Curated annotation (Swiss-Prot):
Subunit and partners: Part of the 50S ribosomal subunit.
Record's keyword annotation contains Lipid metabolism: no
Gene Ontology biological process: translation
Any one cellular-component term (Gene Ontology): cytosolic large ribosomal subunit
HAMAP family cross-referenced by the UniProt entry: Ribosomal_uL16 (MF_01342)
Protein name in the entry: Large ribosomal subunit protein uL16
Family annotation (Pfam families): Ribosomal_L16 (PF00252)
Listed Gene3D superfamilies: Ribosomal protein L10e/L16
Role description: Binds 23S rRNA and is also seen to make contacts with the A and possibly P site tRNAs.
Length: 137
């Protein structure tokens, strides 16, 4: 289950920069515990899926997991041994631009200790520093 859009308005996009803190998605909306990003980065769909699998294995079919980010930015890449020019390369992967303060995952229906352990394992799959947040803090 890779997180890629079914249909897009534009097939390629500019690289851009990730600046500032997140404007939305910084509060818990569904679960009691969450994993919050502390650094800016581009998360790939494979990294999100790997973290989701790690969380699901830790919870052992107890509780519910919400994924609060989605990959909607295409990243293009030209093949190896191709000269400069001749247009932009084809889409290599899909990424999600994450700003500091963004909630990545939420868990509900489990104890805080189990959620903290699941997020600790998921954090090792991600390329950024994250923090554990609870409801009411």
């Amino acid at each position: 289950m890779l997180f890629v859009p079914r249909k897009t308005k534009h097939s390629k996009s500019f690289k851009g920069r990730i600046s500032g803190n997140t404007k939305g998605g910084s509060e818990l909306a569904f679960g009691q515990c969450g994993l919050k990003a502390l650094e800016p980065c581009r998360l790939t769909s494979k990294q999100i899926e790997s973290a989701r699998r790690s969380i699901s294995r830790s919870l052992r079919r107890v509780g519910k997991v919400w994924i609060r980010v989605f990959c909607h930015v295409p990243v293009s890449k030209k093949p190896v041994d191709v000269r400069m020019g001749k247009g932009k390369g084809s889409t290599e992967m899909w990424v999600c631009k994450v700003q500091p303060g963004r909630i990545l995952f939420e868990i509900g229906g489990v104890s805080v200790e189990l959620a903290r352990e699941a997020f600790r394992k998921a954090q090792s799959k991600l390329p950024i520093k994250c923090s554990f947040v609870e409801e009411g803090f």
